[in-house]
Amino acid sequence: MTYEEIKSKACVASSRSKPKNEEHKIQCSCVRYFRLKYPHLRNMLFAVPNAARRSARNGAYMKDEGMLPGVADLILLKSNRFYGALCVEMKKPGEYQRPVQKDWQKECEANGNKYVVVRSLDEFIKVVDNYLKEI
């Protein structure tokens, strides 16, 4: 391959726009809001790192440690009068749950937890504030 061919391929590759990780931005905003509004519960809301791409070896290692597909993105380990915990699945507008996520939702709810799909910071604020009113 000549220098010019390599250079043209590099230019084509670098001219592609990077995908905007909108879901990541929404989740970061939600966590920031929660930690500012509820500092006494800051360590009770945590992320479940299921979405990262992994090698087959690392994926097997994580499954052995208990990682499950379909688990919600955020979990609030605080019960209220009606539920044991709040599980929040983040989705950017226009995206929907995968079948494995719907299966996990059913199991989660069957075991006394609240599960919600959130597509914006405003939705998250409503859900969390309403959930924590019922303590």
Go through the PLM ranges and name each one:
Residues M1-I135:
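Catalytic phosphate/metal-binding cores of nucleic-acid and nucleotide-processing enzymes, i.e., regions
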